[in-house]
Amino acid sequence: MQRINQNMTGYRMPAYVEEILTENYCKNFVRMSIIKDSGKYSFSYKPAGLSRLDPSSMGLYEKLLLIRNLISMSETASDHLIEAESYLIEPELVYSKGGNVDINSLRLLYYPDIKKLEFRYKIVLFADRILNRNIREEREMAERIRSAAEPRDINRLKMFLDKTILRLESNMN
């Protein structure tokens, strides 16, 4: 697969974030290089062995597992000093090995979020974008995710997702 290139102006990336990303210390992100020139950033991603994930071909179980794993990935990124508010979380930026949604197969394209939207809102918006509003069960799930994320406690949302995923797993067996 070829490289993916993005350019950005009007942003200043902390040097430690640049090092963490370019040295691939945090494995949650697609390998990348960064070139700075006169206030302009050029991001070049090398998604070797990865392809963009297509949530439209997934069932509810896989979509919820994807959301839950993105939360776990954000916690790992935070452990590496890259806060979830600092980068975009959108379906187009999620890459995977073989279309799998397990945490070891997923990677994100790091692209700065200038607005620094609160993480719980990003997850709710992500869920809204991947859950199909034409399917009653998925539409209701989007509402439940929104409700679980409302009290500013990401642990509540994690518990809700964990319970729902376990329930769906038991129904599959």
Question: For each of these PLM feature ranges, what is it?
Answer:
Residues 1-67:
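Conserved structural core of kinase catalytic domains
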Residues 1-3, 8, 73, 170-173:
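Gram-positive cell-envelope targeting signals
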Residues 42-44, 88, 105-109:
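Ordered hydrophobic segments in well-structured contexts
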Residues 64-71, 122-124:
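Well-ordered, non-membrane alpha-helical segments in soluble/globular domains
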Residues 72-85:
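Protein kinase catalytic-loop region centered on the HRD/HxD motif
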Residues 82-98:
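A short glycine-rich, hydrophobically flanked beta-strand micro-motif that places a catalytic Asp/Glu
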Residues 97-172:
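C-lobe/activation-segment region of protein kinase-like
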